[in-house]
């Protein structure tokens, strides 16, 4: 690794320990909590949508989130390590076979849906995308 890559890796590690960045990829539905400053007041605004692309690398890495707001498609590009991002949460994992989902821009309704990915655990059981409910006990 050259000097610049080493410095970028150190900075990325330092920024990642302040705020946890979950492992997500295109097709995943995510909620990005963004700090919005209006005059002297500051608040956190949630932006929920489908991640349609991740680009760049290191400190310059960014991702694009697309959502439908009042019937109109809205896309927003966020740098992964931006200080204005309060938190990122993965709502559901999507099953896609592309790295860039720009084709979703031309689709509406059911054709724009993304199937949920089902991950398999080490013992072969199917675990739905990310979160798993606790197993029911005999007392319930």
Swiss-Prot record:
PANTHER family according to UniProt: LARGE RIBOSOMAL SUBUNIT PROTEIN BL19M, RIBOSOMAL PROTEIN L19
GO molecular function, one term: structural constituent of ribosome
InterPro entries: Ribosomal_bL19, Ribosomal_bL19_CS, Ribosomal_bL19_sf, Translation_prot_SH3-like_sf
Keyword Ribosomal protein on entry: yes
PROSITE patterns: RIBOSOMAL_L19
Biased composition (Basic and acidic residues): 113-126
Keyword Aminoacyl-tRNA synthetase tagged: no
Region feature Disordered, mapped onto this chain: 113-140
Entry GO CC: cytosolic large ribosomal subunit
Name of the protein in its database record: Large ribosomal subunit protein bL19
Species for this entry: Xanthobacter autotrophicus (strain ATCC BAA-1158 / Py2)
The entry's keywords: Ribonucleoprotein, Ribosomal protein
